[in-house]
Amino acid sequence: LIFGGTGLLGSAAAQIFIDRGHHVKTIALPPLPEGAPIPKEMEIEFGNFLELSDEQLEAAMTGMDAFVYAAGVDERVEFPAPVYDAYKKYNIDPVDRCLAMAKKCGVKRCVVLGSYFSWLAKTHPEMDLCAKHPYIRSRIDQEKVAAKYADENMGVGVLELPYIFGTQPGRRPVWVILIEQLQRFEKLPFTMYPAGGTAMLTVRQVGECIVGAAEQVQGFRAYGISCYNMHWREFLKIVYRAMDGIQDRKIVDVPKWTFQAFGLHMRKEYAKRNVQSGIDPVGLADIMGMDLFIPTDDTKELGCTPDDIEAAIF
């Protein structure tokens, strides 16, 4: 059973489950994205899983071996303050309720799609990220909630997902925001960007990680997910080749204070719109300026196979 089975990541996982001989069911909101590669073998029930009664949720979970929570919201979705409440509503409370029901129904393994910000917060406690960023605190809290249901009878895995590339027809790609950022430099002979880098992988590789965890997780595991670790400079050159056919765009490292100054401007912009950002734009400078590189051991353990990241970025 996948909640979020018609989304970008859920449908990629569904296809791999089906290819491996598993039966897959999802509860999804209509309409299906037009032209999206949603496996025809997947059983789709239309509805909002957040609004299911206990009886309906129990009926959906009964007889299932595995449950995947590929739903919820990420830091790009805007909410008024306090933004943590929205994350609790969409990311934490449903995981709490669904995993409790999964346990009651004898589901053997559960997989929750989390964030690489959790990996970062745990790896660098000195950065105090949970205090600065409501979104990161919510993802750590989501992991804690998921962990309490894991035991010898039900394995629970949280995938700490980084940047993911690959698109689904009918949906806005993840990196539209990045393109909007880069358009600010159109008139300049160079692009200014922080000096750090990030972990990343393709949509198909996320699907493989989901299926791998659903087939093998024991007890509780938070998996740090990465297949490629790339500096922003290298990544942006790929984006420019894809976007404008520019072979070797000049990228200039932005000092942290410049990014922080831009963050102060963004704080004011959010305040004007009555939005609280889940990632504080001033504190983001610390994250963007570092090499947020995650070892690839966990993805290898989950059975992730190589893919063409450059083609996926396009």
Predicted regions located by residue number:
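Amphipathic terminal alpha-helices
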Residues: 289-314
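Terminal hydrophobic/aromatic helix or amphipathic segment near a protein terminus
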Residues: 232, 236-290
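NAD(P)H-binding glycine-rich loop region in Rossmannoid oxidoreductase-like domains
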Residues: 42-93
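Glycine/proline-rich active-site loop of Rossmann-fold NAD(P)-dependent oxidoreductases
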Residues: 166-179, 213-223, 246
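A conserved pocket-lining segment of Rossmann-fold NAD(P)-dependent short-chain dehydrogenase/reductase
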Residues: 180-201
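Conserved beta-loop-beta element that borders a ligand/cofactor-binding pocket
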Residues: 145-170
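Conserved Rossmann-fold NAD(P)-dependent oxidoreductase catalytic core, especially the SDR/UDP-sugar
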Residues: 93-138
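N-terminal Rossmann NAD(P)H-binding glycine-rich loop of SDR-like oxidoreductase domains
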Residues: 1-20
